[in-house]
């Protein structure tokens, strides 16, 4: 694959993060916030951490689009609501990891168990990360089984 194509989605996500209106997910958030919160970051460090993953992962458009949809659905679920506002690309990143894991027919226990320290700290929306991962993994597993049968 060409180098330019490998980094295209990462570049487009960076532009979206810089250009999109500020949006946060809190309890009772509407569809608009659930669709846009991914592009808001708490600070530059938060943005850099997400993009370090993306630069390594080099997502393609299908992974990115499905990750965005999956993380947006997870954000709309009441179980993922927190008192603190949620923002960032992490839900999309977890959904993209799940897509790769579904193709490999295995669960990434590192991705799943990484939520334990986040739950203990209390300022990270670990439920959103976990739901994004699970929804994406289950969806892709079902899709792949239907496609291959």
Please describe what each predicted stretch is.
Residues 1-149:
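A detector for small-residue-rich transmembrane helices and their helix-helix packing motifs
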């Amino acid at each position: 694959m060409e180098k330019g194509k490998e980094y295209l989605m990462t570049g487009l996500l960076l532009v979206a993060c810089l250009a999109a209106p500020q949006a946060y997910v809190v309890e009772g958030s509407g569809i608009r916030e659930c669709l846009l919160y991914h592009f808001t970051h708490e600070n530059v460090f938060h943005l850099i951490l997400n993009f370090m993953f993306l630069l390594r992962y080099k997502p393609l458009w299908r992974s990115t689009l499905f990750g965005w949809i999956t993380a947006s659905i997870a954000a709309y679920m009441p179980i993922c609501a927190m008192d603190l506002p949620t923002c960032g690309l992490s839900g999309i990143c977890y959904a993209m990891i799940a897509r790769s894991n579904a193709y490999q027919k295995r669960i990434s226990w590192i991705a799943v168990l990484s939520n334990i320290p986040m739950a203990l700290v209390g300022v990270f929306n670990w439920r959103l990360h976990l739901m994004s991962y699970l929804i994406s993994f289950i969806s892709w597993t079902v899709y792949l089984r239907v496609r291959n049968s």
